[in-house]
């Protein structure tokens, strides 16, 4: 069902690329994709979710830093936060037809083999997206982490915040315990998503912003996991 739903998503994605739509109108498609597949996960696998802290979402464009441990949050990002740009390998944009359609959503295309200049690409393109009224989604761990694990957060999101003044919103969850990385197996339960208070980068260094975000996210994940229902039975 996941693959079938994704197939329908790409069909409508290609169709939308042919129409003169605004980014808000185009975003209806990935939002519907995320909502429909997470709904299917609930109906078929008994895997539901709750979202807390939505009152913390700023009314102006912001940068959301997400814990990354599962495929699930790549679906949820489409409806948990307002229309936002996410980063991807620039090679995706080069895929015939599909890459062209994806580019209409204004992703941040990064040459990940470029080392430090990849951070500069992220900041430059991220600044443009924020100026256009879009948010920016960042997974600072850079890859999906196993449950209970993390590593030093990448600095690109925090650096973008410091250079633009955009607030950073940390987002924690326990999805990796129910839908593990590199696995299609989903365990019944409830994923808890918690949106943290915005971090104002004014007067802070990128390192300080990053540390505050990581400390909050990792502490909140530990709290979620320790609570009743925080892990599968």
Write out the residue ranges for each language-model feature:
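Non-catalytic C-terminal accessory region of glycerolipid acyltransferases
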Residues: 120-233
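Generic preference for hydrophobic
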Residues: 51, 64, 86-87, 193-195
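Short amphipathic alpha-helix with an adjacent loop that forms part of the alpha/beta core around
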Residues: 53-58, 125-128
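Catalytic core of membrane glycerolipid acyltransferases/transacylases, capturing the structured
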Residues: 12-35, 42-44, 59-115
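Membrane-interfacial terminal anchoring regions of lipid-handling membrane enzymes
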Residues: 1-19, 28, 32, 55-57, ...
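Short acidic-hydrophobic, aromatic-tinged amphipathic segments that line or gate anion-handling sites
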Residues: 51, 108-111, 201
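Short gly/ser/thr-rich secondary-structure transition/capping motifs
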Residues: 43-51, 119-120, 174-177
């Amino acid at each position: 069902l996941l693959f079938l739903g994704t197939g329908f998503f790409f069909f409508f994605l290609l169709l939308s690329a042919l129409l003169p739509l605004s980014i808000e109108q185009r975003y209806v498609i990935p939002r519907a994709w995320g909502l429909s597949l997470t709904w299917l996960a609930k109906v078929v696998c008994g895997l539901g979710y709750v979202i807390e802290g939505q009152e913390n979402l700023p009314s102006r464009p912001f940068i959301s830093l997400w814990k990354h441990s599962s495929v699930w949050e790549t679906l949820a990002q489409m409806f948990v936060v307002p229309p936002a740009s996410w980063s991807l390998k620039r090679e995706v944009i080069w895929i015939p037809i599909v890459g062209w359609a994806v580019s209409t959503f204004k992703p941040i295309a990064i040459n990940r083999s470029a080392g430090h200049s990849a951070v500069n690409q992220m900041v430059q393109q991220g600044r443009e997206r924020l100026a256009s009224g879009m948010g920016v989604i960042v997974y600072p761990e850079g890859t999906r982490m196993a449950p209970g694990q993390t590593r030093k957060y990448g600095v690109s999101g925090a650096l973008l915040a410091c250079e633009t003044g955009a607030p950073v919103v940390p987002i924690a969850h326990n999805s990796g315990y129910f839908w593990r990385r590199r696995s299609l197996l989903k365990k019944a339960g409830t994923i808890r998503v918690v949106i943290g208070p915005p971090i104002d980068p004014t007067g802070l260094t990128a390192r300080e912003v990053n540390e505050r975000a990581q400390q909050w996210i990792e502490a909140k994940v530990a709290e979620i996991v320790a609570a009743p229902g925080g892990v599968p039975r």
